[in-house]
């Protein structure tokens, strides 16, 4: 772990310094910024009282390098949470292809409070694989950046929300497939799931996207990305059946209970993908609308 003014970096690799992240051994790390560390990273001329101030997070940068082929189906998931005196909070999740080489930068507008020299909201983060198994051939570095301040930004929440996120791809002379990246986070009582993939807009043109809406009910809109991933696993007969169901509903006719059950079983049988499971679980846990952005 390296330290410098107003930022901290966390690297993950095995003991002999190879490009290798054994998630079964290195899956958990804590972003605990204790009293001494907070004071240590302040500059001499910072016009703040390090014992009573705000730490305003600027960004979370995740840089990952991988020797896995682009065809590898596995995903990595970053989960971040924080704890107050009253309760634990899940801040959000981020998923990316384990074969991805590049950088994700999450720019933020959230605050942590220092009172009496103690951090009010210590953060905990986990990096794990989508299926829970060990992944070899990956190295991940996380860098947190923040500014100390006497006043909290007007838009910031304690524990906060993500303002923006974007990806950078390392140019290495190879054709780089953009990673599919999912992120969901709570802001007050609203929940979001963003998919940052330029081709995501194409997913809704597949004609299969109402599939999950039929299963999830009229009060919930599920991310079309899930449907694209599921529809890609369907055989011709299954696609014919889904197309028939979609046409039926599109014409204003409701599905019978047995048709809904068949459709539900079909979806459940096709959700082996790590990202599908991740997004479906996010939707289920949030119990509310999930939006697509590209």
UniProtKB/Swiss-Prot annotation:
Keyword annotations from UniProtKB, A to Z: Host-virus interaction, RNA-binding, Transport, Viral movement protein
Protein name: Movement protein
GO biological processes: transport of virus in host, cell to cell
Domain of life, per lineage: Viruses
GO molecular function, one term: RNA binding
Known role: Transports viral genome to neighboring plant cells directly through plasmosdesmata, without any budding. The movement protein allows efficient cell to cell propagation, by bypassing the host cell wall barrier. Displays an RNA-binding activity.
Keyword flag Transport: yes
């Amino acid at each position: 772990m390296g330290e410098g003014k107003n930022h901290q970096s966390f690297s993950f690799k095995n003991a002999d310094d190879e490009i290798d992240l054994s998630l079964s051994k290195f899956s958990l790390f804590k972003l605990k910024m204790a009293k001494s560390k907070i004071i240590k990273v302040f500059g001499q001329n910072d016009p703040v009282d390090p014992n009573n101030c705000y730490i305003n997070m600027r960004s979370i940068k995740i840089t990952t390098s991988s020797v896995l082929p682009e065809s590898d189906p596995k995903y990595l998931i970053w989960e971040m949470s924080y704890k107050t005196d009253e309760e634990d909070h899940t801040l959000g999740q981020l998923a990316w292809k384990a074969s991805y080489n590049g950088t994700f930068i999450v720019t933020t507008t959230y605050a942590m409070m220092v009172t009496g020299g103690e951090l009010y909201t210590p953060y905990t983060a986990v990096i794990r694989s989508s299926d829970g198994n060990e992944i070899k051939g990956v190295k991940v570095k996380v860098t947190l950046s923040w500014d100390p301040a006497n006043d909290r930004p007007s838009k910031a929440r304690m524990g906060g929300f993500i303002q923006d996120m974007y990806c950078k791809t390392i140019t290495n002379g190879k054709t780089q497939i953009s990673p599919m990246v999912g992120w969901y986070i709570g802001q007050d009582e609203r929940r979001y799931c963003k998919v940052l993939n330029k081709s995501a807009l194409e997913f809704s043109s597949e004609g299969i996207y109402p599939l999950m809406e039929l299963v999830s009910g009229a009060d919930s809109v599920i991310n079309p990305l899930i449907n694209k991933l599921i529809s890609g696993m369907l055989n011709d007969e299954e696609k014919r059946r889904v197309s028939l169901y979609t046409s039926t509903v599109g014409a204003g006719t409701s599905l019978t209970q047995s048709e809904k059950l068949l459709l539900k079983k079909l979806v459940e049988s096709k959700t082996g993908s790590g990202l599908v499971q991740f997004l479906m679980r996010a939707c289920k846990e949030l119990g509310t609308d999930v939006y697509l952005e590209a």
